Amino acid sequence: MAETAASPAHKVYNIAHWSDGYISVNGQGEVEICPDRGRSDARINLPALTRSLAEAGVPLPVLIRFTDILHDRVNKLCNAFNKVTQEQGYRGRYTAVYPIKVNQQRRVVEELLSAEPAASANQVGLEAGSKPELMAVLALAKQAGSVIVCNGYKDREYIRLALIGQKLGHRVFIVVEKQSELPLILEEAKKLGISPLIGVRARLATIGKGNWQNTGGEKSKFGLSASQVLDVVDTLKQAGALGTLQLLHFHLGSQIANIRDIQTGLRECARFYTELHAMGAPIGTVDIGGGLGVDYEGTRSRSSCSMNYSVFEYAYNVVHVLQSECDRQGIPHPDLISESGRALTAHHSVLVTNVIDREYPDNREPTEPAAEAPAPLQDLWRDLESLQDEDSPRSLAEIYHDILHAMADVHAQFAHGLLSLQERAQAETLYVRCCRMLRAELDSANRAHREIIDELNEKLAEKLFVNFSLFQSLPDVWGIDQIFPVMPINGLNRSLNRRAVIQDITCDSDGRIDQYVDGQGIETTLPLPEHDPESPLLMGFFMTGAYQEILGDMHNLFGDTHSVDVKLDQQGQYQVGEPITGDTVAKVLRYVNFEPANLLEAYRQKFRHSGLSEELQQTLLAELSSGLEGYTYLEEG
């Protein structure tokens, strides 16, 4: 989607490279969402949408899901494979299988299954990794013949549920993750009078480097070694059931950044396929698992939160490697499945919330130390004078190192009782003023200055207290240092010369974001527009659609946020679905076995012995009762 030239924010926040065309900034400095890239004129003003939600009784924070983006992601992936298979003459068929563990929200799964034209072509399937997920999948799978892949550990009940799904007309592949599952599959299939569709997960030597590398390769929790795969083949042969071995599955890892890792794994998988085919296994489908990345940071690199390839390049490599090996061996091209849940869902949702407070570095006017003041204060004053003197022979780097040394002396002398509290405060004021003056003089074009600039940006950054819980809404930031694009959604037509570090509202020092996407790569501070009290900033946390909702926890008892689905109608106007109300205080207390009715009774008992007037007791009790039904997040600010 074309950028609006009016806003420098596109470059500052690197929007074009991580948003994949779904986000832009208009001339008024407000973020717009383009959910359907085929209708680039149909844009949704995100601040205006947020205001309309608040007027309708949906306060911040709120998670907004753009369902048209889900449709677009499905079709982008299917179109890439369809184009490659057609151009290369590949004779297998591709199906995009969605692992619902990535985001089990019913509305998300339903939208993925209804994405046209992929849905009508029966190119969208589902994957389950547990009995509860399988129960959901069996209800949601629409068409007869739709693909369902059953992964994870399986007991007899899980296997029977999967076979019932096959009885219902679905193509249910039961993937053998452990050898002990195979006898159960054969026994239950015989009881139900059905020929199962059995898959085998091979544990490859290849791994995709990154945060999730141990989900694939030899350290993988799941899958069979080469000898165990051969044991499965022998067991099926002895049972006269080799014809049931229909699928080969492997998994390199999640969010694979480097296309070379994918190529290497595909070659290993292709060898498994051709060898099994030569042994008489009639495998007709290869499930290449997950791994298709998402460029969260927009650097198009091998960084763990980026990717150095496109969706089309991914599809080409999958098809090319398997086709080449099959043609070399003279065997049929298998149908293809990928489990690309992150690539399908990451872009579709954004958390929008408000800034509740700011904390600025000390900006008081420094005063000259007394003649008898300790040496570190005198040194800081001389450093400040050097910065004010245009003819000073001292370099900026030299002054920076000197003020660091002086402040280290200040801290040491204060700890040993050699400086008073007033003198320490005076030193801090001098230090901050020196840092501000240095930052204004340093030039990012000068390579020698860049590291100092980064350090000063961090030292001078304001703390931005934002109405959300990192542990609930962005748990991967805390858990694995995942990077998500974060930026204001309004005020972007103002000068972007402030820097900040985002803090959440939990009582936990880990409730902050330490890495931010910007035009220079990954930084430790976030660029912000100048503060305008008449136009408070709203913050957007983007690309949160994969894993974050289901992994979020209730640290400090902050619960689920409000959420809404937004879709475009035929005229390009947006329609808001029925909001899903976020957790109330009473609801989260029930999770930890506090019954609200018992709490209210405890409050009543305390009031009876409080000595307060009856009228005041009732007023305060009503307020406590109302508090139990309130939102867990801050409702003012």
Swiss-Prot record:
GO terms for biological process: arginine catabolic process; putrescine biosynthetic process from arginine; spermidine biosynthetic process. InterPro entries: Ala_racemase/Decarboxylase_C (IPR009006), Arg_decarb_HB (IPR040634), Arg_decarbox_C (IPR041128), Arg_decrbxlase (IPR002985), De-COase2_N (IPR022644), De-COase2_pyr-phos_BS (IPR022653), Orn/DAP/Arg_de-COase (IPR000183), PLP-binding_barrel (IPR029066). Signal peptide: none annotated. Transmembrane segments: none annotated. Its EC number is 4.1.1.19. Pathway: Amine and polyamine biosynthesis; agmatine biosynthesis; agmatine from L-arginine: step 1/1. Substrate binds at V286, D287, I288, G289, G290, G291, L292, G293, V294, D295, Y296. The modification N6-(pyridoxal phosphate)lysine is found at K101. NCBIfam families: PRK05354.1, speA. This is Biosynthetic arginine decarboxylase. The lineage of its organism: Bacteria, Pseudomonadati, Pseudomonadota, Gammaproteobacteria, Pseudomonadales.
